[in-house]
């Protein structure tokens, strides 16, 4: 207990490892020791500076691991963690705080590994897309996915911090999806000049820059719709055209909007599934009673080893802890 005193007591590995701030040193086979971890480690393994836990109330309370398969790391401050490229502070367990690595393609994130604040500018998905203006986090998307999303455009003005931005109120993106123009026509989806429509939400071509009035019938994204649907109502679909997935308005609903796969999965609260029998796709909640996982908040489809079909794997639960297998 006193480093300057060569004497001590003999203990088992269990007793040593169960003592706060101590670890077993087997480096000398016939002179094994139960040694004290170096501060600010409150637990360590192998050597005194290989921390497995840090002082949650100290100046460096976050355990930062550089190798996912190695349970040891170093203790760092919040400033040092957040200043490291691709890392974020995780305070979800108050007495076991961690400095964790962001999920690719995030190059910076906050809160959780998949809440990006910056994307790899040279990667396949370099644009940060936010769905809530007051939330600085979002997902990383490609130029194609951004420009294909209704109301969004790609902003390359900052080369190392590209964004997929939503057009301001009263504006619509151009057909290229690279900038926005004023557009007062409610039935217009794309404007290449101020108040000159280039593509109508009704599916009909514009005449002299204006869209024809909506009529009874299905929106251009629908393959089927409700009886009372109008051609400018994208949320009345009962089936979707190829490449789109029906997202029901409610869990029991039979109608909704037809989204692309990226639009469906962008915030990770939904996943895509082919509807058996007619090859029509569905955009389902992670907690869907039939095909999802009860209590799951965020998920993704993954093909697990030995399985031919993709499986829903949960990454965040609503009110429960996540199991290693990804089942809530």
Swiss-Prot record:
Gene3D superfamilies: Hormone Receptor, Insulin-like Growth Factor Receptor 1, Chain A, domain 2. Keywords: Repeat. Sequence repeats lie at residues 38-102, 103-167. Cysteine-rich, antigenically variant surface protein. This is Surface antigen CRP170.
